[in-house]
Amino acid sequence: NGSDFAVSASVNFADTQINGTHWTASLWANDEPATITLPRDGNYLQIRISCGQQANVTIRDRLSAQNIELSAGNGTLTADELYGHRITLDATDGRLSATLPESADQYHVRATANWGTVIMNGTPLVQMDELGNGTAQYDNRAEHVPHDLQARVSGSGQISLLSQIASTNADTPV
């Protein structure tokens, strides 16, 4: 445990670095879930989280930063809420799912897949089958929106996103 974060689990740290608005940690959980708690009042420029090997990572709190980078690799990464100006999501053969706090029309969305699928609000944006059939690239070409979202699947994995639905009542979640 440190003064700027807390960890609950049996974990081994290879590296921890807190430098102003950047926090980096490399850790291994020992056959049990690990929970990392960052201060709520933190004003982060960048948050970068990746799953090693076939790890299973769940983020149960809102991640808020200028830039958010999440990578599921070959594991499973679930994020409850991502709030950032620039969001980059990657999966190889793993699965990444995340909730976005605003409606889809507030994001410039670009998605690519070599074989896997990127889904937003239940609709496939890119989806390739074993024969290479399907759509490999998607760009909603949204301009002058507050958020930039890039989703890439480089293997047979999947990225699934759920955003708020644009409506007259902004408090109604999907």
Language-model-detected regions and their locations in the chain:
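Right-handed parallel beta-helix
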Residues: 2-4, 8-80, 133-167
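Short, surface-exposed interaction patches in beta-rich subdomains
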Residues: 78-174
